[in-house]
């Protein structure tokens, strides 16, 4: 809804902005009533797909904020994720390590050399330092056991 308003306000010329805003509100309310637009469903489904790709909860939250989703809907979505799995960030970080072949997925010889680089990659993807350190300090055997469970 936010992005549609922003787009139409910028693209329509020679019309009062208040008229455009009223028209947009009418159209959006009709679409919401007929369930073509559902922000709750969008935020839940987008969060699930981002978790499957190995994104952190912080990254999911910032993505949904950028899309203009209501803060209460974002809180509900994050709470659902944390209720399903209290340590979701840890498992998402493991998925990212597997995907990017960093941290415990590296060979034992290269792990100390790339430690700072790998921690910074996890931080750029929204993982906090404690989670990143916990993942980076995993043994290769423990990592492989967790990957098999995922």
Predicted regions and their residues:
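An alpha-helical, amphipathic repeat domain used for nucleic-acid recognition
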Residues: 1-150
């Amino acid at each position: 809804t936010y992005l549609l308003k922003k787009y139409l306000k910028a693209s329509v010329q020679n019309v009062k902005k208040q008229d455009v805003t009223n028209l947009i509100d009418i159209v959006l309310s009709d679409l919401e009533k007929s369930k073509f637009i559902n922000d709750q469903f969008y935020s839940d489904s987008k969060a699930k797909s981002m978790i499957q790709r190995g994104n952190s909860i912080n990254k999911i939250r910032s993505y949904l904020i950028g899309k203009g989703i209501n803060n209460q809907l974002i809180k509900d979505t994050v709470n659902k994720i944390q209720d399903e799995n209290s340590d979701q960030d840890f498992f998402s970080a493991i998925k990212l390590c597997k995907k990017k072949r960093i941290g415990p997925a590296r060979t034992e010889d290269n792990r100390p050399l790339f430690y700072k680089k790998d921690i910074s990659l996890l931080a750029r993807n929204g993982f906090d330092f404690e989670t990143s350190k916990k993942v980076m300090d995993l043994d290769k055997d423990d990592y492989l056991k967790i990957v098999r469970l995922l």
